[in-house]
Regions:
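Metallocofactor- and cofactor-centric catalytic cores in central/energy metabolism, strongly enriched
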Residues: 2-107
Length: 107
C-alpha cells in the first residue's frame, strides 16, 4: 500500500522567467490555435499596457498559481513595475504563500 512519503517526493519549483527567453516562443504562438494564440494575444496586450504610461495594469490572481510554481513570476512582475495593483483571492496570499513562508513545500 502506498504511503504519504511515496507521493511527497517531487517538490514544486518556482520558475525564474528571467532565465529563459520566451519571446520567440510566444511570438510563434500567434500562428497557432486556441490557448497558444490567446497567450500570444495576451502578451501583446500586456506589452502595450506596460508601454502606455497612462494605463493602469491590474493583475488578477485566482487558483493555485503559487503552489503551481508561479510565485516568482508574480514577484518579478511586481519588482519590475509591470503591475500597478493586484486583486487576489485569499487562498493565494494566505494559504499558498504563507505556508511556503513557514517552510512548507508544495508537491
Amino acid at each position: 500500500m502506498s504511503e504519504k512519503k511515496d507521493f511527497l517526493k517531487e517538490v514544486v519549483k518556482h520558475i525564474d522567467i528571467k532565465q529563459h527567453n520566451v519571446v520567440p516562443l510566444v511570438d510563434a504562438m500567434a500562428d497557432m490555435a486556441f490557448t497558444a494564440r490567446d497567450l500570444n494575444r495576451a502578451a501583446n496586450i500586456l506589452d502595450t499596457m506596460i508601454k502606455d504610461k497612462d494605463c493602469a495594469v491590474i493583475l488578477t490572481l485566482a487558483g493555485s498559481l503559487f503552489s503551481a510554481g508561479l510565485k516568482k513570476v508574480v514577484y518579478d512582475m511586481i519588482m519590475n513595475n509591470m503591475v500597478d495593483a493586484i486583486v487576489s483571492t485569499g487562498a493565494i496570499m494566505v494559504d499558498q504563500d504563507f505556508f511556503e513562508a513557514l517552510g512548507f513545500k508544495h508537491y
